[in-house]
Amino acid sequence: MGFTTRVKSEASEKKPFNFALFWDKYGTFFILAIIVAIFGSLSPEYFLTTNNITQIFVQSSVTVLIGMGEFFAILVAGIDLSVGAILALSGMVTAKLMLAGVDPFLAAMIGGVLVGGALGAINGCLVNWTGLHPFIITLGTNAIFRGITLVISDANSVYGFSFDFVNFFAASVIGIPVPVIFSLIVALILWFLTTRMRLGRNIYALGGNKNSAFYSGIDVKFHILVVFIISGVCAGLAGVVSTARLGAAEPLAGMGFETYAIASAIIGGTSFFGGKGRIFSVVIGGLIIGTINNGLNILQVQTYYQLVVMGGLIIAAVALDRLISK
């Protein structure tokens, strides 16, 4: 009797509040709510309109896509600094294919995305072959891919391609803009990969400890290659969406977007030291970036200050992750 009573009393005792666990699950939502509340109070007549909120989701779609790709690179304690250049080159190839007569535009889109995947594969192969840190490799390929984009475009914008392509990404389905649906579908696929497939579990294990992953039978080089292919495909998809939204392929598109990609992943709770993160938290991280940019634009704050805010958020997010993990 006494034993039963003791067990019940111990089971009924409340566990102490675990801030680290709470923040890991709900931190990004908390940050987004605070930011929305701040801008909503500063400019309710513009910021809190249905049209503006829809625009935030649409504008965030590109950031969310490259952020999800960056998430995988960071998940294995790496980084991909070439996502902006891959975005530009994939978008340029998509536009060039349509101008060359590739029809329907879906075929040109697939071509652009495949280019993104191929560029990601180059990154992965170079990381595996040289043994250098992905920071060095992708810093170099960022310049190479950007240079190729400038060469094939003669440093000029490319436009005049399929109106159906532009109109497709300007349309909505049951009130939801196509770029938003596009991003959500990709997020669902990547969520399934990371939570329901062995490949995803292996990637997490690789990020946690490469040596342990190797000795447990995980093919480290193969998974690093896959990670960078995923990053490249996501950047390629972002390039397609960006080209459609702009109505032109810009050789300098995506300049500095690696900052947004990293910020989306880190603010979304992905550990910069690898092995921890959730894909839908990265989606919220991308929305946070989009909301901040939108709010600052409404308040007529110069773009330069937006970069200052992004840099500060990255430092704060990494510092908080380090503090919580101790």
Swiss-Prot record:
The keyword Transmembrane helix applies. NCBIfam families: PRK09699.1. It is found in: Cell inner membrane. Part of the binding-protein-dependent transport system AlsBAC for D-allose; probably responsible for the translocation of the substrate across the membrane. Belongs to the binding-protein-dependent transport system permease family. AraH/RbsC subfamily. The gene is alsC. InterPro entries: ABC_transp_permease. The keyword Cell inner membrane applies. It is a multi-pass membrane protein. One of its GO terms (molecular function) is transmembrane transporter activity. GO terms for biological process: D-allose transmembrane transport; D-ribose transmembrane transport. One of its GO terms (cellular component) is plasma membrane. The chain crosses the membrane at residues 19-39, 71-91, 102-122, 125-145, 150-170, 173-193, 222-242, 253-273, 279-299, 300-320. Residues 1-18, 92-101, 146-149, 194-221, 274-278, 321-326 are cytoplasmic. This is D-allose transport system permease protein AlsC.
